[in-house]
């Protein structure tokens, strides 16, 4: 596991410890790997999920650090979303 993935998993675990999420989501970080959130658990995996977010390392770092709103990233084409948009919106509220 790369340092970038390890840092992202840690950042997501911290966010999820303070919030509730009742779905599954995958973050595909270009050139690094994938992270899954299932309920409030965060781990590395490439399993199928309700929704998948795809972006570069830089974009995910900005989102995880609270520097970039996920909705803005999606609307400007920096973040790609495949799957259930309702689940995507619920998870975006966690980052809100």
Stretches with model-predicted labels:
Residues 1-96:
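Feature captures hydrophobic
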């Amino acid at each position: 596991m790369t340092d970038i993935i390890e840092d992202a998993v840690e950042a997501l675990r911290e966010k999820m410890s303070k919030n509730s999420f009742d779905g599954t989501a995958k973050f595909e970080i270009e050139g690094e790997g994938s992270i899954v959130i299932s309920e409030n658990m965060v781990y590395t995996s490439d399993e199928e999920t309700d929704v998948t977010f795809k972006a570069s390392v830089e974009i995910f770092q900005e989102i995880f650090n609270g520097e970039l709103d996920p909705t803005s990233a999606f609307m400007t084409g920096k973040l790609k979303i495949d799957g259930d948009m309702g689940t995507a919106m619920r998870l975006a509220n966690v980052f809100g």
